Swiss-Prot record:
It comes from Prochlorococcus marinus (strain MIT 9312). It comes from the Bacteria. DNA-dependent RNA polymerase catalyzes the transcription of DNA into RNA using the four ribonucleoside triphosphates as substrates. HAMAP family: RNApol_bact_RpoA. This is DNA-directed RNA polymerase subunit alpha. GO terms for molecular function: DNA binding; DNA-directed RNA polymerase activity; protein dimerization activity. InterPro entries: DNA-dir_RNA_pol_insert (IPR011262), DNA-dir_RNA_pol_RpoA/D/Rpb3 (IPR011263), DNA-dir_RpoA (IPR011773), RBP11-like (IPR036603), RNAP_asu_C (IPR011260), RNApol_insert_sf (IPR036643). SMART domains: RPOLD (SM00662). The gene is rpoA. GO terms for biological process: DNA-templated transcription. It catalyses: RNA(n) + a ribonucleoside 5'-triphosphate = RNA(n+1) + diphosphate. It holds the Pfam family RNA_pol_L. Its EC number is 2.7.7.6. Residues 1-228 are annotated as: Alpha N-terminal domain (alpha-NTD).
Length: 311
């Protein structure tokens, strides 16, 4: 069944975050929930994004310090850097730098990055420098997926003045969806429409976010469309060493031995296919000979059933 996707609203906030609202339908009953849940999960946790992962501040070696002549303390500056909406097209580490003198209200646009890094909200405040004081920053930006907490073990091996930050790479901030069950197709059969609201940090548009999420789901399900089921053939169990013992080594009487040989019984393996009743049906094979065979098998740890297995 073909369905349509319509963007019914698109807004850009003062902080450059974007909100897109989409209608998807008509869908069969139940499909809207399937689509909504799948897209929401990928949108919120599966898309790659950019984030500040570490900050170096000249003269500072721990996050609880204060900076002379700067209104904000180090924790405030780290939080402001963490909240930056950034889009880096470089899969490798990018480093931005700031050297500023007061009086100055430092904003995100004051940080110098390469052409591969775009600061979405350039007016985001970073710090306030008083007259006669300086501030030097080095900001590390990386690409990633999801949320990456500070690695405390790795932190011990990094430079003492490089302050690591819990990185939030998720470009989508919020996803809401609802289902409209009022649509009715020809013939009176029920239909659904999925209404999705996607809010991004501005580093990507809601349209691109949905497209990327859909492509990830396609890649996830594609192998299932071409899977070939191969029936496993069970391996034949290897016979036990006792089953390989030839009939001669059971030390049977001549009468019992000859009767079994005429019945094409040449080894213990052949005897294991017989029951006590089967032995009695061998020509000239009486109960005494059958008991003799049972005892010989029990001496090597093998037993056979008294009667045939019923089918």
């Amino acid at each position: 069944m073909q369905y349509q996707i319509e963007r019914i609203d698109h807004q850009i906030a003062d902080d450059r975050s974007q909100t897109g609202t989409f209608l998807i339908g008509p869908l069969e009953r139940g499909q809207a929930t399937t689509l909504g849940n799948s897209l929401r999960r990928v949108l919120m946790g599966g898309l790659e994004g950019s984030a500040v992962t570490a900050v170096r501040i000249a003269g500072i070696n721990h996050e609880y310090a204060t900076i002379p002549g700067v209104r904000e303390d180090v924790l405030d500056i780290l939080l402001n850097c963490k909240q930056l909406s950034i889009n880096s097209s470089n899969p490798e580490l990018e480093i931005g730098r700031l050297v500023a003198s007061g009086p100055l209200d430092v904003k995100a646009n004051d940080i110098q990055f390469s052409s591969q890094v775009e600061i979405v909200d350039g007016e985001k405040p970073i710090a306030t420098i008083q007259e006669g004081h300086n501030l030097e920053l080095e900001i590390h930006v990386e690409r990633g997926v999801g949320y990456r907490p500070v690695d405390r073990k790795n932190q011990e091996t990094t430079a003492i003045d490089l302050l690591q930050i819990d990185a939030v790479f998720m470009p989508v901030k919020r996803v809401n969806f609802s289902i409209d069950e009022t649509a009715v197709a020809e013939g009176g059969t029920g239909r659904e429409r999925l209404k999705m609201e996607v809010v991004t940090d501005g580093s990507t548009s809601p349209d691109d976010a949905i497209a990327e999420a859909a492509n990830q789901l396609i890649e996830l399900f594609q192998p299932l469309a071409t899977v070939t089921m191969v029936e496993e053939i069970p391996e034949e169990p290897e016979p036990s060493p006792e089953a390989q013992i030839p009939l001669e080594e059971l030390n049977l009487s001549v009468r019992a031995y000859n009767c079994l040989k005429r019945a094409q019984v040449n080894s213990v393996s052949d005897l294991m296919g017989f029951s006590y009743e089967d032995l009695l049906e061998i020509k000239n094979f009486g109960s005494k000979s059958a008991d003799e065979v049972i005892e010989a098998l029990e001496r090597i740890g093998i037993s056979i059933p008294q009667s045939r297995t019923s089918v």
